[in-house]
């Protein structure tokens, strides 16, 4: 996965996630949406076979990069909890 910032301001972040598909992008979008202060989060993939996911995050009371970091930490925590539970099977 490669992260490429296309546009960044105090309240807006546009970035690409090279090498990712809808699977991870939907998860990331939903986790960013849960972060307090996020106004808009969306992504698009222009072509289903060769397109690169492009995200838009707009915030009101938090820096967009901090919202992204918070969402990624949440995903990591949930994955670790799932791994522990799966090991019990």
Question: Can you name each region flagged by the protein language model?
Answer:
Residues 1-89:
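Protein-protein interaction/assembly regions in multi-subunit complexes
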């Amino acid at each position: 996965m490669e992260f490429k910032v296309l546009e960044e301001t105090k309240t807006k972040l546009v970035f690409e996630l090279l090498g990712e598909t809808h699977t991870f992008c939907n998860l990331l979008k939903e986790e960013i949406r849960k972060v307090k202060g996020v106004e808009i989060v969306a992504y698009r993939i222009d072509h289903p076979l060769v397109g690169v996911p492009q995200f838009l995050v707009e915030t009101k009371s938090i820096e967009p990069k901090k919202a992204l970091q918070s969402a990624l930490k949440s995903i990591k925590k949930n994955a670790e909890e799932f791994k522990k539970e799966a090991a019990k099977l």
